[in-house]
Amino acid sequence: MAPMGIRLSPLGIGVFCLLALGVLYHVYSGFLTGRFAAFLLGDRAGDTVDLRELLAVSVRAAELGGVEVKKVRESNSLNEKAKGKTREGEDEKMTSGDVLSNKKMYHLIKNAFPAVLVNTEEQVDPDEEDAVSWDHDIPDEIKDKIKTSKPVSSESITIWIDPLDATHEYAENLVKYVTTMVCVAVNGKPVIGVIHKPFTGYTAWAMVDEGANIKKRSSYNEKTPTFIVSRSHSGEVKEVTRQTFGNKTEIISAGGAGYKVLSLLDVTADEQEKADVYIHVTYIKKWDICAGNAILNALGGHMTTLKGEEISYTGSEQNEGGLLASIGMDHSALVGKLAEKISVNAKKPAK
């Protein structure tokens, strides 16, 4: 008698082989996809970052940068030079304060979180090293507001550093306008903002949906708002805003995007002018505005282009659409009143 067993037909064997090949293909192709993604992302692949820790590092970075900024200014060793031209044809200034602050801020963040992408105003030699390190201390002020860790994937993060905001005013010794800033964007949205004033030691920080050490003011003037604007743009803004809101509309001319954002908030313990709306009518770099955008978002405010568009903090360093920032106001109404009159100037040189 022939032994009993299972006999497969040639068709059955063929089907089995095809199924096995299909399984192997999916397993192996998934493996290759993962390896390829890791190759593209380098050290960033698969890492997670705690946003609470990153906030603590960002605050420390802004403070360390501020130490360098203040030291250079007080020693009068600016070594001022032009690093290029602005679109308006003016020299774009750089000082030792910019360079030394940039070095400290960049390396502190990269040494603490090597997997994150950092965009900074001044060039950094990737082979240059700095021993500055984070001590892993999270200040009680942050732990009181943000109780637990907030992990996100490192590849979703873009950090924007401004090592010295208001360089022009810094060179003129108008130091009240000077700030150092750090912003953390997650998938292009500003989530963490830090603005530090080196010459007073004041620091504002916020994390969207989590907490802040600063708040909005108790009231704002929507009928005849006070506008704050760059010192070189006050003439054209004054004309448009007074046509829209009346001759009693006040214009504050000031330096520094960080200073202007703080003017919208409750900064009672520091020398700070107060405004209701911040307008910028030409293009502006994202490291100038990201930190302020994050803080305003965390407090329920808004920062958009002059057309009311949200600003994405990925890709290009430039924001071409001008700027409108407010809090405690009807932002959409402001956009509606001002967009048609000002947006046409967004790419024109400042007067």
Swiss-Prot record:
Keywords, ordered alphabetically: Hydrolase, Magnesium, Membrane, Metal-binding, Transmembrane, Transmembrane helix
Intracellular or extracellular location(s): Membrane
Cofactors: Mg(2+)
Official protein name in the record: Inositol monophosphatase 3
Family membership noted in the UniProt record: Belongs to the inositol monophosphatase superfamily.
SUPFAM superfamilies the record matches: Carbohydrate phosphatase
EC number assigned by the record: 3.1.3.25
GO CC term (a single one): endomembrane system
Alphabetized InterPro entries for the sequence: CysQ/Inositol_MonoPase, Inositol_monophosphatase-like, Inositol_monophosphatase_CS
Catalysed reaction equations from the record: a myo-inositol phosphate + H2O = myo-inositol + phosphate
Main location class: membrane
Binding residues for Mg(2+) 1: 121, 162, 164
Keyword Magnesium included in the entry's annotation: yes
